[in-house]
Amino acid sequence: ITNRLHTSYRQTGTATGRLSSNDPNLQNIPVRTDLGRRVREAFISGKGSSLLAADYSQIELRVLAHFSRDPALMKAFENEEDIHSATSSLVYDVPINKVNSDMRRIAKVLNFGVIYGLSPHGIARQTNLSQSDGKKFINIYFDKYPGIQKYLDGVKTQCREKGYVETILGRRRYLPDISAKNFRLRSQAERAAINMPIQGTAADIIKIAMINIQNRLNDLNMKSMMILQVHDELIFEVPNTELSQMESIVSELMPSSLKLDVPLSVEIKRGYNWGNLT
């Protein structure tokens, strides 16, 4: 008996390879709502310890840059630019320092929409643009990032030929509906074909990081514990005497868990409760 709340993780709970959490699901507690933050504040570290959260920054877009080898996308990450501002600059044809919050918000929808196969209707629904404007922005996006368009078309073609897509480490997802005559089934399979290699590779990366970090903790006989995984984020309970060492370990092992053609970046926060990490 630990007098603590324990979740369960499933390795095969999702089609892309992401871990899923249940009983209770601690991966779905909102972070951007007031209620979600208040719930997170209930999760506290033990006496003499702190919580340390390490979050991969834009990992799925970095994986997309690696796969697509689009020069503009790769350059933005190599220069450590804010990727949504960089996309705004290209799409709106303005200097990056002239990008405003509305421009960045639309660029963010476009960037993540590409990964999930978002349609002009989906863009319009998330941005309050018209469908015609949504389509226009998608066309401009692919005009500025032609490598992404080429990569996505190639993924769908390869999936039709082989019947599956795979992550960077070769983990496959078979999609028999990719050649379905039914438009809805075929479109759904095409979106899955686009998303799985990206999200699945991101899942591979964080799982490798988890193994490497735990091995290091064991080797050093440290008392720090990995207590949560929330997709792109790892959360540890760390004795205050180990905080500096733990931050160094995470900063070393998470960005180096798998070699990509763009750098991986990790943001680290710490604090007493999960809702107030800085």
Predicted regions and their residues:
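Conserved catalytic core of nucleotide polymerization and phosphodiester-bond processing enzymes
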Residues: 1-278
